Design a protein with these regions (language model features):
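A common structural junction motif
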Residues: 28, 92-93
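Short, structured motif recognition centered on aromatic/hydrophobic residues
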Residues: 4-9, 20, 32, 67-73
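Alpha-helix boundary/capping residues
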Residues: 24-27, 88, 101-102, 109
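Short amphipathic alpha-helices within nucleic acid-binding modules
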Residues: 18-22, 65-69, 77-90
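Glycine-rich beta-strand-turn "strand-cap" elements at beta-sheet edges
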Residues: 37-64, 93-125
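Core segments of cupin and vicinal oxygen chelate
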Residues: 17-40
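Helix-capping/helix-break motifs at membrane-protein junctions
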Residues: 13-14
Length: 125
């Protein structure tokens, strides 16, 4: 497997988005970058649009998503991902300080991670 991305989607607990963003930007992202992670982007999902065709007519339904946080990380290959996961998530700092705080801000049972490979024309490689 060659280079790929993780698209990570979290549900932030109600009323915790500002606190989560501060924690991500001041603590988690710098910590993970220091450990070797490559972060391509960090986003708040404002809304989702779903499209369908009904009776030959295209329709769009929009849903507000103010508690959804999305970020993208890049890995060289599966071994690189496993090495960085171990360096981050098995570290004393993560287990004793960062991880417990994460559990106070997001619903860890709702985390979704999509592994993506860029297509030939993608600018993200």
């Amino acid at each position: 497997m060659s280079a790929f991305f993780e698209l990570r989607i979290y549900q932030v607990l109600p009323g915790k988005m500002e606190e989560w963003l501060t924690f991500m930007e001041d603590t988690i992202i710098p910590y993970q970058v220091k450990k070797g992670m490559v972060i391509h982007g960090s986003f708040v999902m404002d809304s989702s649009d779903e499209f369908s065709v009904q009776n030959g007519e295209r329709t769009m339904n929009s849903e507000t998503k103010g508690n959804t946080y999305v970020w993208i990380r890049r890995f060289e290959n599966k071994d690189h991902k496993e090495k960085l996961y171990k360096a981050v998530y098995e570290s004393t700092d993560w287990m004793n300080e960062i991880g417990p705080r994460v559990a106070q801000l997001i619903d860890r049972n709702s985390i979704v991670v999509h592994n993506l490979t860029s297509t030939q024309l993608s600018i993200m490689k």
